[in-house]
Amino acid sequence: MKKTQVLLLTLFSFIGILMLVNCIINFEGTSLYQLLFWMFIAGLCESLPVYFARNRVVTVTLAVLLTLQLSHGTYFTTLVAASAAIFYLIKTEDGSFKHTFNLPYYKTMANFSNFTISAYLSGLLYDFLVDKLNISVNSPYMILVIFMYFTATFILNTVLVSVFLRIVSGSPIIETW
């Protein structure tokens, strides 16, 4: 890899790690069992991808993250999202398995950073909208806030993946997005 690629991937990973550290510092205590349970569920959802086109995959992890955002808040959600990027196991077409320990480190770090950054920033948007607009859980406007959360997570996730692919392979962002 070229030095600029390594530098950009390091910066990308560093931002994700900083956001995760911020979540750990600001995390309000929840039972360790709850945290482990949701980490397991998120890792399981990430391990069961749905292929809808060649090399195009979607998982239901976003639904788990929305559930956590509504019930536990941004910091807990980001911790679980980061763990989902690490604790997954996918069986490939040839019968082998893909997991954190047999992928190149830069792919694992990019996936980790992508999940962390998109969950954290989307969670901050959710918190901002709920707090500043004074929207309660029972408000009909909550549907709009949830839609904004989904949209922000989707856009951030896909843009970050496209940027990562641009850094690694040099392919245009628009083509990979």
Predicted regions located by residue number:
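Membrane-embedded alpha-helical hairpins and interfacial helices in multi-pass inner-membrane proteins
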Residues: 1-42, 46-63, 71, 75, ...
